[in-house]
């Protein structure tokens, strides 16, 4: 039932978007979706795919879709952020987008709240991307459930000011370095 709500909301918002802005899929270089899981978003892409689009355009939209789901396949569902993780995945894993290209975006939330909107790539956007992120994701170390639970349930000893210092995270890019008044503070690890 939830899958059908997702797809019905996509169809409704896409039709309304087309009506308001007089745009079709041919106007977009890519479509990014809220990704509870990639197969549902793929069904969505197929649901809105215009049968009259040239095969070359259909292939490009499919290629960009495949690039947009790479991070979600590694990370899993991050709920609200999944659309933007998909956008980041697309931008960092393609070489066929350029400034001026339009990207359609479909946001969906529980309760059948949905929105269809678009963005346009600006000059210089590539400077903000990490083209090696997929490689970094592939280099992660799997934790056993026991090791994960050990870290997750670890008690933090707070001092009398509700603060704590941390060490031992020197091999990571970012680390929890302290807690001050119940606020976690993270920092980029200088290597």
Where on the chain are the PLM-derived regions?
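Terminal domain-initiation and capping elements
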Residues: 1-191
């Amino acid at each position: 039932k939830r899958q059908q709500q997702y797809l019905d909301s996509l169809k409704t918002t896409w039709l309304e978007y087309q009506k308001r802005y007089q745009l079709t899929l041919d106007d977009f270089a890519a479509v990014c979706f809220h990704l509870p899981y990639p197969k549902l978003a793929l069904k969505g892409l197929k649901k809105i795919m215009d049968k009259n689009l040239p095969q070359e355009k259909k292939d490009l939209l499919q290629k960009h879709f495949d690039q947009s789901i790479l991070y979600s396949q590694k990370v899993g569902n991050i709920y609200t952020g999944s659309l933007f993780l998909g956008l980041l995945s697309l931008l960092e894993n393609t070489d066929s987008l350029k400034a001026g290209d339009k990207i359609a975006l479909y946001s969906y939330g529980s309760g059948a709240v949905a929105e269809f909107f678009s963005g346009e790539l600006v000059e210089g956007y590539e400077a903000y991307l990490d083209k090696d992120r997929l490689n970094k994701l592939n280099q992660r170390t799997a934790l056993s459930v026991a090791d994960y639970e050990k870290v997750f349930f670890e008690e933090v000893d707070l001092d009398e000011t509700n603060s704590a210092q941390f060490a031992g995270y020197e091999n990571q890019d970012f680390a929890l370095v302290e807690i001050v008044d119940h606020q976690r503070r993270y920092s980029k690890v200088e290597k």
